[in-house]
Amino acid sequence: MFDNKTILITGGTGSFGHTFIPLTLKKYNPKKLIILSRDEMKQWDMAKLYADDPRVRFFIGDVKDRDRMYRALDGVDYVVHAAATKIVPTAEYN
């Protein structure tokens, strides 16, 4: 399914991404796995884990930014939408 495909995972530096990414890289052979996250520090930390894997790319962005999302989606075959706000009162307030 994901073999030789480009996958974008929104919220990829979160808890779901930490499980999904290594599993996908091991079980399938994606052409590219783009990790979209608004958290630069989490991307920096995660980039160290995948520094030797040219299939893994990082993209700073927010799913609420339409122009940034259009740019991130260019050439993507599949989107795994895992972006979320975990703190319910914050999500309800905003």
Task: Give residue spans per PLM region.
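N-terminal Rossmann NAD(P)H-binding glycine-rich loop of SDR-like oxidoreductase domains
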Residues: 5-27
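Glycine/Thr-rich phosphate-binding loops of Rossmann-like dinucleotide-binding domains
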Residues: 17, 43, 88-89
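Conserved glycine-rich Rossmann-like NAD(P)H-binding loop of the short-chain dehydrogenase/reductase
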Residues: 28-42
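Catalytic, metal-anchored helix/loop core of enzyme active sites in primary metabolism
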Residues: 1-4, 15, 55, 64
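Short alpha-helix adjacent to the SAM-binding motif of class I
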Residues: 42-49
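NAD(P)H-binding glycine-rich loop region in Rossmannoid oxidoreductase-like domains
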Residues: 50-94
